[in-house]
Amino acid sequence: LKAKIYSSFVYPVSLSDAKLLEDVIIAGFPLGKEVSAAIKISKGSVSSLAGYGDNYSNFQTDAALNQGNSGGPIINKKGNVIGVAVANYGKKEGIESFNFGVKSSTLRAFANSNGIDFEYPNTRELTNSKLGELITEGTVFIECHMTLSKIKKVVNELEKNKKAVYEQFIK
């Protein structure tokens, strides 16, 4: 993995999970640098409080989530992380807006169990220009320099150990 990080900014993480119909912004680099090296955002709302297969550590959003958004922040109008972009299932089946994020409570639990601290969340909504500044400063492009065959090997290994990996992440 390779990243150029020029800022010490850390997103604050929300103390509460996303709310149904809450406005969200997904920040990331869909298609990597193929389109451009500039950050891209999509806006939408929380459309379900459960993820695929009734996974309650995730939520669903109608904000566009594409390859290259995974691992990126899903933030609210206060600039707080309310989730992390993880999956888009709709394109395979021709369904739109079937996008998922890991809830902030799951993120906090994982971080707390690994001794990672967070910034205290913002309490007021931010202007669009301020949100844009925070997103630009707080979201970085991370390149993966693995070959496709190595990635497939890692994915196959994860699939074999999915339950153990999942249980370790959820603790």
Annotated model-derived regions:
Residues L1-V10, A37-I116:
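Active-site region of chymotrypsin-like
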Residues V24, G44, F59, T139-V140:
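A broad, low-specificity signal marking well-ordered, structured residues that form hydrophobic/aromatic
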Residues N80-K171:
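C-terminal subregion of chymotrypsin/trypsin-like serine protease catalytic domains
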